[in-house]
């Protein structure tokens, strides 16, 4: 939200200002909010190299997430695009404080690498929900649940916002979560 207010360039400059980070966290705490959501539109595998991610993108984001966690605020991050090459970086957080929602990331690897400490969320493709059959949608959801649910820490949902989904596919997504998503 701060990015919407400040604009992208100002936000990038502000990330170096630890006082601004402290003031922002204090305002979040004062508001009673216990989760902060981050849409990560520019960190995916195709936007920058792993070396660039490691040097420029990840250190400041990790620092911000840890500052929130230190203040008792959970971080929920939406990873637009593919984060397959980022998974090894993004899971080193205290257990139960960080949620990663994925759009086009290999969910088996995401669960394997992140699932011990972080909640993994996603990634039923919006194209499947918009254009797929009911049977294909249910089968995709079943496989995702079988892959990601063991051990807990998984939420079945769309990979991105779904604005054009077929109602019957949304219904079958919910039915599949009730049928296959029961922890035993």
Segments from the language model and where they lie:
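Active-site loop segments of alpha/beta catalytic cores
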Residues: 1-184
């Amino acid at each position: 939200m701060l990015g919407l207010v400040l604009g992208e360039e100002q936000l990038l400059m502000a990330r170096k200002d630890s006082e601004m980070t402290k003031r922002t966290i204090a305002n979040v705490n004062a508001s009673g909010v216990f989760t902060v959501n981050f849409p990560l539109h520019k960190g995916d595998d195709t936007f920058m190299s792993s070396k660039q991610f490691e040097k420029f993108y990840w250190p400041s984001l990790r620092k911000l997430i840890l500052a929130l966690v230190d203040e008792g605020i959970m971080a929920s991050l939406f990873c637009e695009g593919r984060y397959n090459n980022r998974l090894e970086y993004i899971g080193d957080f205290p257990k139960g404080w960080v949620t990663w929602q994925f759009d086009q990331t290999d969910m088996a690897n995401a669960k394997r690498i992140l699932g011990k400490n972080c909640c993994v969320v996603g990634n039923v493709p919006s194209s499947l929900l918009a254009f797929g059959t009911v049977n294909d949608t249910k089968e995709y959801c079943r496989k995702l649940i079988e892959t990601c649910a063991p051990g807990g820490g998984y939420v079945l949902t769309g990979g991105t916002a779904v604005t054009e989904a077929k109602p019957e596919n949304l219904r079958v997504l919910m039915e599949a979560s009730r049928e296959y998503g029961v922890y035993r």
